[in-house]
Amino acid sequence: AIPAPKRFGAPVFVSRPYSIGETESEERAAYVSLNLRVGGQLDPVEYSAYQALDYVLLKAPGALLHDALIEEGFGDDVYGGYANGIREPYFQITAKHLRREQKDSFLRRVRELLTEIAEDGLDHEMLLAAINMAEFRAREANFGSAPKGLVYGLQSFESWIYDADPCLH
């Protein structure tokens, strides 16, 4: 089995340069990403719950977190979601094309919005839509051009490599 990774004792901030096109401005070229370790990979209920949150917060039309951050001027796009299939899954929220000086206000606003959402609750219709989508995908098992056997095999590794039931997810 793959051992658990060593945890950070405190938040880690990383800044790296990247290339932009000659016609692009450096003024709004920053990307800021908040990545939070969440839940337990080997808990199928949490696994499903975070997938639903991913949809409601970032991917659905009218997604709560996505739309609020865009409306407040935090970049041209906000994306991310639940990264699963690893021992310590994480939830990522990334804004692209911000000004560098927006980093701290972006991180603060994300935490404020998540707190507000936790206190006020989720829109039940959006949550039901997320659950219905997940159920439909599971029943249809339509993986596009990928063979079902291959997809199921890869999914089994999400828990099997950690000595858990390969049929967990």
Language model feature labels by segment:
Residues 164-169:
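Short, intrinsically disordered, charge-balanced linker/junction segments flanking boundaries
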Residues 1-44, 55-108, 123-155:
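Non-catalytic beta-strand/loop surface segments
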Residues 117-121:
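Inter-helical turn/loop segments and adjacent helix faces that build the functional surface
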Residues 160-161:
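Catalytic nucleophile-loop/oxyanion-hole region of alpha/beta-hydrolase
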